[in-house]
Protein backbone atom coordinates (compact mmCIF):
# COMPACT_ATOMS: atom_id res chain seq x y z
CA UNK A 1 0.00 0.00 0.00
CA UNK A 2 1.70 3.16 -1.13
CA UNK A 3 -0.72 5.74 0.24
CA UNK A 4 -0.39 6.70 3.89
CA UNK A 5 -3.35 5.62 5.98
CA UNK A 6 -4.82 7.24 9.06
CA UNK A 7 -3.62 5.90 12.39
CA UNK A 8 -7.02 4.28 13.03
CA UNK A 9 -7.59 2.99 9.49
CA UNK A 10 -9.94 0.06 9.03
CA UNK A 11 -8.91 -2.77 6.71
CA UNK A 12 -10.88 -5.61 5.15
CA UNK A 13 -9.05 -8.75 4.09
CA UNK A 14 -10.13 -11.50 1.72
CA UNK A 15 -9.18 -15.15 1.36
CA UNK A 16 -10.40 -15.77 -2.19
CA UNK A 17 -11.64 -19.22 -3.13
CA UNK A 18 -13.66 -20.62 -6.00
CA UNK A 19 -16.61 -21.50 -3.73
CA UNK A 20 -16.13 -19.26 -0.69
CA UNK A 21 -14.41 -15.99 0.14
CA UNK A 22 -13.34 -15.52 3.74
CA UNK A 23 -13.49 -11.96 5.05
CA UNK A 24 -11.78 -10.40 8.06
CA UNK A 25 -11.68 -6.90 9.49
CA UNK A 26 -8.81 -5.19 11.25
CA UNK A 27 -7.55 -1.88 12.53
CA UNK A 28 -4.15 -0.22 12.20
CA UNK A 29 -4.30 1.37 15.64
CA UNK A 30 -4.78 -1.90 17.51
CA UNK A 31 -2.98 -3.98 14.87
CA UNK A 32 -5.49 -6.74 15.38
CA UNK A 33 -7.67 -8.67 12.96
CA UNK A 34 -10.78 -10.76 13.47
CA UNK A 35 -12.67 -13.18 11.27
CA UNK A 36 -15.85 -11.61 9.98
CA UNK A 37 -17.91 -13.63 7.49
CA UNK A 38 -17.79 -16.02 4.59
CA UNK A 39 -19.19 -14.86 1.25
CA UNK A 40 -20.43 -17.60 -1.05
CA UNK A 41 -18.72 -17.18 -4.40
CA UNK A 42 -21.73 -18.10 -6.54
CA UNK A 43 -21.08 -15.71 -9.41
CA UNK A 44 -19.62 -12.27 -10.08
CA UNK A 45 -22.88 -10.41 -9.38
CA UNK A 46 -23.45 -12.12 -6.01
CA UNK A 47 -19.76 -11.83 -5.04
CA UNK A 48 -19.50 -8.09 -5.61
CA UNK A 49 -22.94 -7.32 -4.19
CA UNK A 50 -21.96 -9.05 -0.93
CA UNK A 51 -18.53 -7.42 -0.87
CA UNK A 52 -20.08 -4.02 -1.65
CA UNK A 53 -22.41 -4.41 1.33
CA UNK A 54 -19.45 -5.21 3.59
CA UNK A 55 -17.53 -2.21 2.28
CA UNK A 56 -20.57 0.04 2.87
CA UNK A 57 -20.92 -1.31 6.41
CA UNK A 58 -17.26 -1.27 7.50
CA UNK A 59 -16.03 1.68 5.39
CA UNK A 60 -12.48 0.34 5.05
CA UNK A 61 -9.61 2.61 4.11
CA UNK A 62 -7.82 -0.22 2.29
CA UNK A 63 -8.14 -3.87 1.35
CA UNK A 64 -5.82 -6.86 1.71
CA UNK A 65 -6.06 -9.95 -0.50
CA UNK A 66 -4.33 -13.24 0.15
CA UNK A 67 -2.13 -14.40 -2.70
CA UNK A 68 -2.05 -18.20 -3.02
CA UNK A 69 1.32 -19.59 -4.06
CA UNK A 70 2.93 -23.01 -4.31
CA UNK A 71 5.16 -23.95 -1.34
CA UNK A 72 8.22 -22.89 -3.37
CA UNK A 73 6.66 -19.45 -3.97
CA UNK A 74 5.71 -20.08 -7.58
CA UNK A 75 2.32 -18.82 -8.76
CA UNK A 76 -0.45 -21.17 -9.89
CA UNK A 77 -3.97 -20.94 -11.32
CA UNK A 78 -5.52 -19.60 -8.09
CA UNK A 79 -2.81 -16.93 -7.89
CA UNK A 80 -4.17 -15.36 -11.07
CA UNK A 81 -7.77 -15.66 -9.89
CA UNK A 82 -6.99 -13.98 -6.57
CA UNK A 83 -5.08 -11.22 -8.37
CA UNK A 84 -8.00 -10.66 -10.73
CA UNK A 85 -10.36 -10.49 -7.74
CA UNK A 86 -8.13 -7.94 -5.98
CA UNK A 87 -7.78 -5.84 -9.11
CA UNK A 88 -11.56 -5.90 -9.56
CA UNK A 89 -11.99 -4.78 -5.94
CA UNK A 90 -9.67 -1.85 -6.62
CA UNK A 91 -11.50 -0.94 -9.83
CA UNK A 92 -15.02 -1.26 -8.44
CA UNK A 93 -14.53 0.31 -5.02
CA UNK A 94 -11.55 2.62 -5.63
CA UNK A 95 -9.71 1.34 -2.55
CA UNK A 96 -6.02 0.47 -2.41
CA UNK A 97 -5.28 -3.26 -2.36
CA UNK A 98 -2.26 -4.94 -0.78
CA UNK A 99 -1.27 -8.54 -1.39
CA UNK A 100 -0.15 -10.99 1.30
CA UNK A 101 1.48 -14.36 0.68
CA UNK A 102 -1.17 -16.72 2.00
CA UNK A 103 0.82 -19.94 1.94
CA UNK A 104 -0.28 -22.10 4.88
CA UNK A 105 -2.90 -19.58 6.09
CA UNK A 106 -5.64 -22.24 5.87
CA UNK A 107 -3.47 -24.71 7.79
CA UNK A 108 -2.90 -22.11 10.51
CA UNK A 109 -6.61 -21.22 10.47
CA UNK A 110 -7.69 -24.86 10.92
CA UNK A 111 -5.22 -25.34 13.77
CA UNK A 112 -6.45 -22.19 15.51
CA UNK A 113 -10.09 -23.17 15.16
CA UNK A 114 -9.39 -26.67 16.53
CA UNK A 115 -7.43 -25.27 19.46
CA UNK A 116 -10.31 -22.94 20.37
CA UNK A 117 -12.99 -25.54 19.70
CA UNK A 118 -14.57 -23.32 17.05
CA UNK A 119 -16.57 -24.62 14.10
CA UNK A 120 -14.46 -25.86 11.21
CA UNK A 121 -16.89 -24.28 8.72
CA UNK A 122 -15.42 -20.88 9.64
CA UNK A 123 -12.01 -21.77 8.19
CA UNK A 124 -12.25 -19.33 5.26
CA UNK A 125 -13.01 -16.34 7.48
CA UNK A 126 -10.31 -17.46 9.91
CA UNK A 127 -7.84 -17.75 7.00
CA UNK A 128 -8.69 -14.15 6.06
CA UNK A 129 -7.96 -13.18 9.68
CA UNK A 130 -4.58 -14.93 9.49
CA UNK A 131 -3.79 -13.10 6.23
CA UNK A 132 -4.74 -9.73 7.70
CA UNK A 133 -2.85 -10.38 10.92
CA UNK A 134 0.25 -11.26 8.86
CA UNK A 135 -0.14 -7.95 7.03
CA UNK A 136 -0.53 -5.98 10.26
CA UNK A 137 2.37 -7.80 11.94
CA UNK A 138 4.56 -7.01 8.93
CA UNK A 139 4.08 -3.26 9.18
CA UNK A 140 7.10 -1.41 10.56
CA UNK A 141 6.72 0.21 13.96
CA UNK A 142 7.23 3.57 12.28
CA UNK A 143 4.48 2.99 9.69
CA UNK A 144 3.64 6.28 7.99
CA UNK A 145 0.27 7.70 9.03
CA UNK A 146 -1.65 10.76 7.85
UniProtKB/Swiss-Prot annotation:
SUPFAM superfamilies: Ribonuclease H-like
Molecular function GO labels: nuclease activity
Classification via Pfam families: RuvX
GO BP field: rRNA 5'-end processing
Subcellular location: Cytoplasm
EC code: 3.1.-.-
Gene3D superfamilies assigned to the protein according to its UniProt record, in alphabetical order: YqgF/RNase H-like domain
UniProt-listed InterPro entries: RNaseH-like_sf, YqgF, YqgF/RNaseH-like_dom, YqgF/RNaseH-like_dom_sf
Gene Ontology CC annotation, any one: cytosol
Sorted UniProt keywords: Cytoplasm, Hydrolase, Nuclease, Ribosome biogenesis
Entries under NCBIfam families matching the protein: RNAse_H_YqgF
Function in brief: Could be a nuclease involved in processing of the 5'-end of pre-16S rRNA.
Family recorded in the similarity comment: Belongs to the YqgF nuclease family.
Protein name stated in the entry: Putative pre-16S rRNA nuclease
Species of provenance: Burkholderia mallei (strain ATCC 23344)
Amino acid sequence: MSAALSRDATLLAFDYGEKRIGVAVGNLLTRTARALVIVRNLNREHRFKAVGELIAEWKPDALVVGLPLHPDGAPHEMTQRAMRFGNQLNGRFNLPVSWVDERYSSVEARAGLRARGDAADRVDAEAARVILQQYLDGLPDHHEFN
